Amino acid sequence: MKTDGFMTPDELMRLSRDYVLEHGGLTILSLDYVVENGKMFGESLWWDRSDGYYICDFSGDEEVYFTGLGYDIYKNGNIQFYRYYKNGLEDGIEAKFYPSGVLKSYTVIYDENKIALAYEWYENGMIKMFFDRDHEYIFNEHGEITEQGQV
Protein backbone atom coordinates (compact mmCIF):
# COMPACT_ATOMS: atom_id res chain seq x y z
CA MET A 1 0.00 0.00 0.00
CA LYS A 2 1.01 3.57 -0.61
CA THR A 3 2.19 5.89 2.11
CA ASP A 4 1.93 9.17 0.20
CA GLY A 5 -1.87 9.38 0.33
CA PHE A 6 -2.45 8.40 -3.29
CA MET A 7 -2.91 5.11 -5.10
CA THR A 8 -2.77 4.30 -8.77
CA PRO A 9 -6.08 3.64 -10.52
CA ASP A 10 -5.11 -0.06 -10.74
CA GLU A 11 -4.42 -0.25 -6.99
CA LEU A 12 -7.77 1.38 -6.23
CA MET A 13 -9.56 -0.93 -8.64
CA ARG A 14 -8.15 -3.95 -6.79
CA LEU A 15 -9.83 -2.69 -3.60
CA SER A 16 -13.19 -2.01 -5.25
CA ARG A 17 -16.10 -4.14 -4.13
CA ASP A 18 -16.60 -5.73 -7.55
CA TYR A 19 -12.94 -6.70 -7.86
CA VAL A 20 -12.70 -8.08 -4.32
CA LEU A 21 -15.89 -10.10 -4.75
CA GLU A 22 -14.69 -11.55 -8.05
CA HIS A 23 -11.03 -12.16 -7.19
CA GLY A 24 -10.79 -12.07 -3.40
CA GLY A 25 -12.41 -15.38 -2.60
CA LEU A 26 -15.17 -13.81 -0.50
CA THR A 27 -18.34 -15.82 -0.11
CA ILE A 28 -21.55 -13.87 0.40
CA LEU A 29 -24.46 -15.85 1.82
CA SER A 30 -27.90 -15.48 0.25
CA LEU A 31 -30.79 -14.03 2.24
CA ASP A 32 -32.59 -17.38 1.99
CA TYR A 33 -29.60 -19.23 3.44
CA VAL A 34 -29.17 -16.73 6.28
CA VAL A 35 -32.86 -16.82 7.25
CA GLU A 36 -33.02 -20.62 7.02
CA ASN A 37 -29.82 -21.28 8.98
CA GLY A 38 -29.50 -18.26 11.28
CA LYS A 39 -31.27 -16.62 14.18
CA MET A 40 -32.64 -13.10 13.96
CA PHE A 41 -31.85 -10.41 16.51
CA GLY A 42 -34.85 -9.35 18.53
CA GLU A 43 -36.57 -12.71 18.19
CA SER A 44 -34.29 -15.05 20.12
CA LEU A 45 -30.92 -13.26 20.09
CA TRP A 46 -30.14 -10.30 22.33
CA TRP A 47 -27.09 -8.42 23.56
CA ASP A 48 -26.29 -9.10 27.19
CA ARG A 49 -24.60 -5.83 28.11
CA SER A 50 -24.16 -6.82 31.74
CA ASP A 51 -21.85 -9.59 30.58
CA GLY A 52 -19.66 -7.49 28.30
CA TYR A 53 -21.77 -7.52 25.13
CA TYR A 54 -22.11 -11.24 24.67
CA ILE A 55 -24.82 -12.47 22.33
CA CYS A 56 -27.32 -14.65 24.14
CA ASP A 57 -29.91 -17.06 22.84
CA PHE A 58 -33.17 -16.78 24.77
CA SER A 59 -35.15 -19.25 22.68
CA GLY A 60 -34.91 -22.07 25.24
CA ASP A 61 -35.60 -22.32 28.93
CA GLU A 62 -32.40 -20.56 29.92
CA GLU A 63 -30.05 -17.91 28.55
CA VAL A 64 -27.01 -19.37 26.79
CA TYR A 65 -24.14 -17.77 24.92
CA PHE A 66 -24.94 -18.13 21.25
CA THR A 67 -22.85 -20.09 18.76
CA GLY A 68 -23.99 -19.88 15.15
CA LEU A 69 -25.21 -17.41 12.55
CA GLY A 70 -27.02 -14.25 13.68
CA TYR A 71 -28.62 -11.64 11.44
CA ASP A 72 -31.00 -8.71 11.17
CA ILE A 73 -33.17 -7.40 8.35
CA TYR A 74 -34.14 -3.89 7.28
CA LYS A 75 -37.82 -2.94 7.27
CA ASN A 76 -37.73 -3.15 3.46
CA GLY A 77 -36.90 -6.88 3.69
CA ASN A 78 -33.24 -6.63 2.69
CA ILE A 79 -30.62 -8.11 4.96
CA GLN A 80 -28.91 -5.58 7.24
CA PHE A 81 -26.07 -7.84 8.39
CA TYR A 82 -25.11 -11.35 9.25
CA ARG A 83 -22.23 -12.59 11.39
CA TYR A 84 -21.06 -15.74 13.05
CA TYR A 85 -20.68 -16.12 16.81
CA LYS A 86 -18.87 -18.56 19.05
CA ASN A 87 -19.72 -18.66 22.75
CA GLY A 88 -21.48 -15.31 22.45
CA LEU A 89 -18.60 -13.47 20.75
CA GLU A 90 -18.08 -12.59 17.09
CA ASP A 91 -16.01 -15.27 15.40
CA GLY A 92 -15.96 -15.87 11.65
CA ILE A 93 -17.42 -13.79 8.84
CA GLU A 94 -19.42 -10.60 9.24
CA ALA A 95 -21.13 -9.01 6.24
CA LYS A 96 -23.07 -5.73 6.41
CA PHE A 97 -25.30 -4.33 3.69
CA TYR A 98 -26.79 -1.00 2.66
CA PRO A 99 -30.63 -0.76 2.73
CA SER A 100 -30.47 -1.14 -1.06
CA GLY A 101 -29.05 -4.65 -0.58
CA VAL A 102 -25.54 -3.74 -1.78
CA LEU A 103 -22.65 -5.12 0.28
CA LYS A 104 -21.29 -2.45 2.64
CA SER A 105 -18.54 -4.30 4.50
CA TYR A 106 -16.93 -7.69 4.90
CA THR A 107 -14.90 -8.64 7.97
CA VAL A 108 -13.06 -11.79 8.99
CA ILE A 109 -12.98 -12.22 12.77
CA TYR A 110 -11.00 -14.88 14.64
CA ASP A 111 -10.31 -15.88 18.24
CA GLU A 112 -13.62 -14.41 19.32
CA ASN A 113 -13.41 -10.70 18.41
CA LYS A 114 -9.97 -10.20 16.79
CA ILE A 115 -10.14 -8.77 13.27
CA ALA A 116 -7.93 -10.41 10.65
CA LEU A 117 -9.21 -8.59 7.56
CA ALA A 118 -11.86 -5.96 6.89
CA TYR A 119 -13.18 -4.10 3.87
CA GLU A 120 -15.75 -1.32 3.86
CA TRP A 121 -17.04 0.25 0.67
CA TYR A 122 -19.03 3.31 -0.28
CA GLU A 123 -22.38 2.40 -1.80
CA ASN A 124 -20.96 3.04 -5.28
CA GLY A 125 -18.34 0.30 -4.71
CA MET A 126 -15.27 2.47 -4.06
CA ILE A 127 -13.16 1.41 -1.10
CA LYS A 128 -13.82 3.33 2.13
CA MET A 129 -11.67 1.35 4.59
CA PHE A 130 -9.23 -1.53 4.37
CA PHE A 131 -7.74 -3.27 7.39
CA ASP A 132 -5.46 -6.25 7.72
CA ARG A 133 -3.54 -7.48 10.75
CA ASP A 134 -0.78 -4.93 10.13
CA HIS A 135 -2.30 -1.79 8.60
CA GLU A 136 -5.45 0.28 8.37
CA TYR A 137 -6.31 2.67 5.53
CA ILE A 138 -9.25 5.08 5.34
CA PHE A 139 -10.18 6.53 1.94
CA ASN A 140 -12.32 9.45 0.84
CA GLU A 141 -14.81 9.14 -2.03
CA HIS A 142 -12.06 10.07 -4.52
CA GLY A 143 -9.83 7.17 -3.50
CA GLU A 144 -7.34 9.29 -1.59
CA ILE A 145 -5.98 7.90 1.67
CA THR A 146 -7.15 10.22 4.45
CA GLU A 147 -5.87 8.16 7.39
CA GLN A 148 -3.46 5.29 7.73
CA GLY A 149 -1.60 3.52 10.44
CA GLN A 150 -0.02 0.38 11.67
CA VAL A 151 -2.00 -1.83 13.95
Predicted regions span which residues?
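Glycine/tyrosine- and acidic-biased, solvent-exposed loop/turn segments at the edges of beta-strands
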Residues: 1-151
